[in-house]
Amino acid sequence: MTEYTPDEKLRLHQLRKLRRRWLKDQELSHREPVLPPQKMGPMEKFWNTFLENKSPWRKMVHGVYQKSIFVFTHILVPAWIIHYYMKYHVSEKPYGIVETKPRIFPGDTILETGEVIPPMKEFPDQHH
């Protein structure tokens, strides 16, 4: 086996040194990671400032607010959607479904009035 040449030894030494430096750079200091501040929406900002004073009535108001949001999103909105679907898509509309009327031929009797349909007139000059 041949030994490394001086250039190869120098290159290996530099690569090891570079690797050690890279690994050391990967360690985080006690100040890292620096995260950007969270941006709050207007409602979240309001409730955070409202609940800073932890009085019982404020907690109750917040609880009522949360329950009303739950009722609105999980009960009322689905109920409205179901009501709309039932009203406009499922229930039978008066005159919504039109059926073809049965054919009437000469000699037939109309059930509602009892009227008998008279025979058709003969038209000798026209071909049928």
UniProtKB/Swiss-Prot annotation:
Purpose: Accessory subunit of the mitochondrial membrane respiratory chain NADH dehydrogenase (Complex I), that is believed not to be involved in catalysis. Complex I functions in the transfer of electrons from NADH to the respiratory chain. The immediate electron acceptor for the enzyme is believed to be ubiquinone.
Keyword Electron transport annotated: yes
Main location: mitochondrion
Membrane topology note: Single-pass membrane protein
Residue numbers carrying N6-acetyllysine: K24
Family under the similarity heading: Belongs to the complex I NDUFB6 subunit family.
Recorded name of the encoding gene: NDUFB6
Protein's organism: Pongo abelii
Protein name: NADH dehydrogenase [ubiquinone] 1 beta subcomplex subunit 6
